[in-house]
From Swiss-Prot:
Organism: Acinetobacter baumannii (strain ATCC 17978 / DSM 105126 / CIP 53.77 / LMG 1025 / NCDC KC755 / 5377)
Biological process annotations from GO: translation
Protein name: Large ribosomal subunit protein bL12
One MF term in the entry's GO annotations: structural constituent of ribosome
Gene from which this protein is expressed: rplL
Known role: Forms part of the ribosomal stalk which helps the ribosome interact with GTP-bound translation factors. Is thus essential for accurate translation.
Example of a GO cellular component annotation carried by this entry: cytosolic large ribosomal subunit
Protein family: Belongs to the bacterial ribosomal protein bL12 family.
Length: 123
């Protein structure tokens, strides 16, 4: 007997956050998909020229992905925060990790966090 959408929603509503994270990971594995947000194309023209002139960037953690522990370690290393503060920051994604950094520093931090499994944007 197939479950109705209502029954599925009720079952999901009863799960804890940790159980939901595990469920999402299982969906990603089974169907070979990613729950990461789709990047939106940047506007062309004048906005591109303004982006070239920008000298300071904000590093924003948009998602911690499947490997939250590795992302927390990378955030601690990059920011010098304690374990609890780094964990709260990661779990509260999207969050700005660093403000007013150079493009080089921002790209380096973005690379480290993405290697740990996070989704990061420079703004």
């Amino acid at each position: 007997m197939a479950l109705t959408n209502e029954e599925i929603l009720n079952a999901v509503a009863e799960k804890t956050v940790l159980e939901l994270v595990e469920l999402i990971s299982a969906f990603e594995e089974k169907f070979n998909v990613s729950a990461a947000a789709v990047a939106v194309a940047a506007p062309a023209g004048g906005a591109a020229a303004a982006a070239e002139e920008q000298s300071e960037f904000n590093v924003e953690l948009t998602s911690f992905g499947a490997n939250k522990v590795a992302v927390i370690k990378a955030v601690r290393e990059a920011t010098g925060l304690g374990l609890k503060e780094a964990k709260d920051l990661v779990e509260g994604a999207p969050q700005v990790l660093k403000e007013g950094v150079s493009k080089e520093e921002g790209e380096e931090l973005k690379k480290k966090l993405e290697e740990a499994g996070a989704t990061v944007t420079l703004k």
